[in-house]
């Protein structure tokens, strides 16, 4: 039976994965009585790829955290609920094929974990680290839903590749540092393992964008090469706890990504400052594409909250004391960004968006504290 810290962490991670799936599959969140109730068998290759890839991390997370069977069945149940709700969303088309591919993806994710943990000959300590016993691994897992959301927006606007690249650079830095400290000796095999891990991570997260393979493949291959190169370089520090030094390199890149994401497209014409209450006032077919970048923005603030909490991890601040600080800092960032967005042509600043991203940041910080509590339990501290 899992300990309390493991149960809490599992619930938070699985809840986060399910929440992101719901955000991506149920937007624009507008319900209406349908003219016809039923499911279709129609689909296309893009939807097949997206639906499989979307549920792979869910199945992986399920086995990773709960270590129980049933990911296949649970994926089918969640997918059926989603497709049933889509009957009442005018711009959505519920499909039996979607249920089957979601279920397949969930099973593949669970199988991937089983293969890594039981079939591949790696030290048990490495499998332990894969199970989030290294705080930076939590960041790697949280970046996967961010890549999902980015990939959906990328598909509608290919010129957003720079945002995909910035997320990838964050992953590159984290993977290279983790592998450097997992293996003290430098060898081509360690660099190769780091590159393969980074590549698998990127292509799982960017699966929905594989319908435009050239830019995605280019970024993925560049990511793998850079990860291998950075892993082969000598360690800059011999400290056992290397998270803070790694975060110093991640923060500038992630900060630039967050700013560009909020202002995208940054070259839009300027106008008088203006603000709106909600996200959008249009519920049309195009609204799905308009909302995808906004969902990416919410997910990005969850990652920001995790980064901020991990930055102060050494101080051992309890969650109750850290939440007010997270609230103040994330509120300051959110309001500063909305102030800048208000001068751009278009919807302008959004009060609802500012509130929602602060909540997202608090959730990200909470995940870090749950993870840290679980690590302390595993270490007997």
Regions found by a protein language model. Give the residues of each.
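Bulky hydrophobic segments
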Residues: 1-97, 103-381
